[in-house]
């Protein structure tokens, strides 16, 4: 038993034939060793696809972690067991269909790291750093979540990950925390959502609290500080929102960040013309700040949740197309049957729109997918977010170097998508040039960009 387990700890998962050959034993001897090893091994696959791996402990705990899915009413249901394998992989033992598509290597549940549907649960960005800083001592992890290993991430998620993006929860402790929220909401004990009349006072206070958490300089890193909140929705139900905000001073850099928040709101308003869903947003100006309030599309009412996975997570696990365009992502997904052809075409239009919008930050994490409708491709484009002219973001958070808008004509293979996107981008620039929530100086930039794009259209 020991040679088998030690070998698998060093070498990672192995198929039966290769394992017997490398150990110099017969299949029958191997099967006896596997049975004797018992729970020290993780076994997945059937017949010739069977593979074996040594079980790995998480902070001294060798038991597998339950994975739960939260439904539209807020009720969690276990869908899988997550087994950790040596030296640094994992295996999903499905109790219900996962829903998210898997490539051939992952069909039996094997992953080289965390399963990709769990990758976006890891803390990241402004809110993720705030979470890490607040809980680092308790969790015994770095204050920088970018430095966390997969095991650090799983440890944090299993204890405190009850309210991450999407609809998945890992670990019994985190699930119990979610159930405490459910109980409080159903008993009428949860904090009441903000009323419309309260926003002008509440949002500046929440922004001050977010900045006081000790995370200054996020704009210097090219991102907006933000907070989450609940407010009364138009239908009377509680609505979860993500709120980005500008600084409160009147410096040129702060005014530019404010302008860009308004631009993001305006961009979302024209995307329907491209056949694309966009996150529902609005601008609130109060307390000397500009707030972009975005309705969370993975939350429904007080407790409901739905699944969400970024292209970055899917790409890293299944495609390896880092640094490629979203148009190429759409083609790759459609070629595998994971995305409908018309959705892939919509992604090509979105990519061209973003380029004509001067969005220089269309990375893999800024594109996400939902589960597709039953009977069709497994993926569907999630509402678009973070679409704004980042070319004009202040350098180092404060400086405003001159930036030149230079829209380009498309290559022949991109012409159809470009021709669909260009009039919509022109509409955006026209709206931005006329919107008085944007500073006069940047409205002038938008007006000049309108002229340049109109000239290119002919």
Please tell me what each predicted stretch does:
Residues 2-458:
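Phosphate/dinucleotide-binding and metal-coordinating scaffold of catalytic cores
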